[in-house]
A protein has these predicted regions:
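ASCE RecA-like P-loop NTPase motor cores
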Residues: 1-20, 25-28, 33-274
């Protein structure tokens, strides 16, 4: 079956408080430093405390300024399709990398390259790229990997020129990158982009929120990850004629309480769980 991203979650009975119901994640949910099936049942999740627009406004000190949210000029229901891997092993499991490579290969074949593969872990990206090189050689695809000596701007231009190539990138390729046209038809997100909680600045921010009686996960970690997720997905459709797929290889969007918030943050489009 197919479902649509961007649909509203079901409110819990009697939920009058706009605070998120996600709460603090369990230990296994916290971000770590280090063939077709049916869609999963809808998750129950109260509305997030802030919309993405309101969250950003508060972050820049403009929370009291009236906002205007303008509709997109793009027809995402026709231009974009979202795939979600429904059965991915935990990243700590020995079979995780094999499963990750399997799905990357599957979807890269589908579009014959023309793909961004976005990672949150630099070491994992390098290892996966190295293991997949024979696959790229077999298909005759160039693979550009961030951090291998080529400047970021040069790598991006080479990717645009070679219409059958793949680019593996981390943080800086999730945003501020514009590849209109058919050079990019596939964005693969390997993991939801939660910030590493032990970074000094992030840690200080989380501690400050908790000290003020807030929920560091619901008030900061989750909305920040959703914003970055939206930015990553946004690499795909840059003009009214662009078409392509987004692939999410992190089944937390299906089986964690907060996962529905990521799907709701996307434009309405067809979704298929694989």
């Amino acid at each position: 079956r197919e479902a649509a991203a961007g649909s509203k979650a079901t409110e819990e009975p009697g939920a009058s408080d706009p605070a998120p119901a996600v709460g603090q994640p369990s230990a296994e949910e916290r971000p770590s430093a280090s063939a077709k099936t049916g869609c999963q049942p809808a998750l129950r999740l109260r509305p997030a405390r802030l919309t993405p627009l309101a969250y950003v406004a508060n972050r820049v000190g403009a929370g009291d300024v009236p906002g205007l949210q303008v509709g997109s000029p793009f027809d995402y229901e026709e231009q974009m399709k979202l795939y979600v891997a429904g059965k991915m092993p935990d990243p700590r499991d020995t079979g995780y990398k094999d499963a990750l490579i399997h799905w990357i290969e599957h979807f890269v074949r589908l579009t014959h390259g023309k793909a961004f593969v976005l990672f949150t872990n630099f070491k994992l990206m390098q290892e996966v790229a190295e293991r997949m090189q024979p696959f790229f050689d077999e298909l005759g695809l160039a693979c550009f990997v961030q951090g291998t000596g080529m400047p970021r701007s040069t790598m991006l231009e080479e990717f645009k020129l070679d219409r059958d190539s793949v680019l593996f990138g981390t943080d800086s390729f999730w945003q501020g990158v514009d590849v209109p046209g058919d050079a990019l038809s596939n964005v693969i997100i390997t993991r939801l982009p939660f910030a590493v909680p032990d970074h000094p600045l992030i840690e200080a921010r989380l501690e400050d929120i908790e000290a003020k009686g807030g929920n560091s996960f619901g008030d900061f970690s989750l909305p920040e990850a959703i914003l970055k997720f939206r930015q990553g997905v946004g690499r795909l459709i840059r003009t009214q004629t662009d078409k392509g797929i987004v692939v999410v290889l992190d089944n937390r969007v299906l089986n964690k309480r907060y996962g529905q918030a990521f799907l709701e943050a996307l434009p309405k489009c067809p979704v298929e769980v694989v």
